[in-house]
A protein has these predicted regions:
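Non-catalytic, mostly N-terminal accessory regions of nucleic-acid modification and defense proteins
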Residues: 1-192, 251-264
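Generic recognition of stable, solvent-exposed alpha-helical segments in well-folded globular domains
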Residues: 6, 10-17, 35, 39, ...
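Conserved Class I SAM-dependent methyltransferase catalytic core
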Residues: 14, 21, 30-43, 185, ...
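A generic secondary-structure signal for well-formed alpha-helical elements
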Residues: 42-55, 164, 214, 218, ...
Length: 327
């Protein structure tokens, strides 16, 4: 078994260094999905294995009973998708296909993850030797630690997101808002309970910090409901994974969609709205939305969506609700 101390000493950098091995000639935008997918897969497998061993020790024969896991918010991992099985095939030519099959098997057993996990590890552009090396590195890292597993992986996931955003420069801001900015918004709004909404949620950082705020103030995370939306399918999936590893069940719509042209929460009136919308968005679709009911304070300019974002949020705000917006 891997040394659990690795989870608290340079853990984030250890994972990031492993990610860099995979990069090769790929752009950050391409390989971040591979890396974040592997982190997610290793984490849910580790968490499953811990519960599995606990059930084996109890001796009642329930270690393959899916209800034993889902009742505790643990994703069920089928035998062929467990990390121990993947690790044995790390240095075979089929390792990419093995991981893709594992992702499909996990989605099949866990409806919440359907169509969310990346399944592009078998593609020719991904160096299978390097992929096997990263699997080896992850095999020797324990992704969970009793009593704080969500925070450990959450911290790692957030660290990698920030590093990817830094590498991608301006484009990285589309899926990641610096944690210091997010914390400031959350501390001002104080979302203790009620409906929390982010109309351009990126990787879900606003929701994660809201949940942390509730937990840090001895509140109950079940007292907040999470609603969000993002137009980028890859980012939407990142948000789903980011929230899943923290035990947060959001409503991000059935699919990724443009907030202006396809509002996935048309009747929502949120108690807290926090967002970092794309600044000065020029081509946002006003020609199709001139008569939209959201424009109570005048039609926004066609060449700049800033006023449209503000009005969209006001439209979705409950009578006593509060907005925190980065603009």
């Amino acid at each position: 078994m891997a040394d659990r101390n690795t989870a608290t000493i340079g853990f984030e950098k250890q994972i990031w260094d492993a990610a860099c091995v995979l990069r090769g000639n790929m752009d950050a935008s391409e390989y971040k999905n591979v890396v974040l997918g592997l982190i997610f897969l290793k984490y849910i497998s580790d968490r499953f294995d811990d519960k599995y061993q606990e059930l084996v020790e109890e001796g009642d024969g329930f270690e393959e009973d899916i209800d034993e896991y889902t009742s505790e918010g643990i994703f069920f991992v089928p035998a062929n998708a467990r990390w121990s099985e993947i690790a044995t095939k790390a240095h075979t030519p089929e390792i990419g296909a093995v991981i893709d099959d594992a992702m499909r098997a996990i989605e099949k057993e866990n409806k919440r993850l359907k169509d969310i996990l990346p399944k592009n590890f078998a593609r020719p552009e991904l160096d299978k030797r390097r992929l096997g090396d990263v699997v080896d590195l992850f095999t020797n890292i324990q992704m969970i630690e009793h009593g704080s597993e969500k925070d450990i992986l959450g911290r790692t996931y957030e660290y990698c997101l920030s590093m990817f955003a830094e590498q991608e420069g301006k484009r990285g801001g589309e899926f990641f808002t610096p944690s210091c900015v997010v914390r400031t918004l959350v501390e001002v709004l104080k979302p203790f309970k009620g409906r929390v909404y982010d109309p351009c949620c990126g990787s879900g950082g606003m929701f994660v910090q809201s949940a942390k705020f509730v937990e840090n103030h001895s509140g109950n995370i079940s007292n907040i409901s999470i609603y969000g939306q993002d137009s980028n399918p890859t980012t939407w999936k990142m948000a789903q994974m980011n929230l899943a590893i923290r035990g947060i069940e959001p409503d991000l719509g059935a699919y990724a969609a443009d907030t202006f042209l396809d509002d996935r929460h048309p009747t929502l009136r949120a108690d807290y709205i926090m967002a970092n919308p794309p600044f000065n968005l020029s081509d946002w679709g006003l020609d199709k939305l001139k008569e939209d009911q959201r424009w109570k304070y005048g039609i926004p300019p066609a060449g700049n969506a800033n006023f449209a974002w503000l009005q969209h949020m006001i439209f979705h705000l409950a009578p006593a609700g509060r907005i925190g917006m980065v603009l």
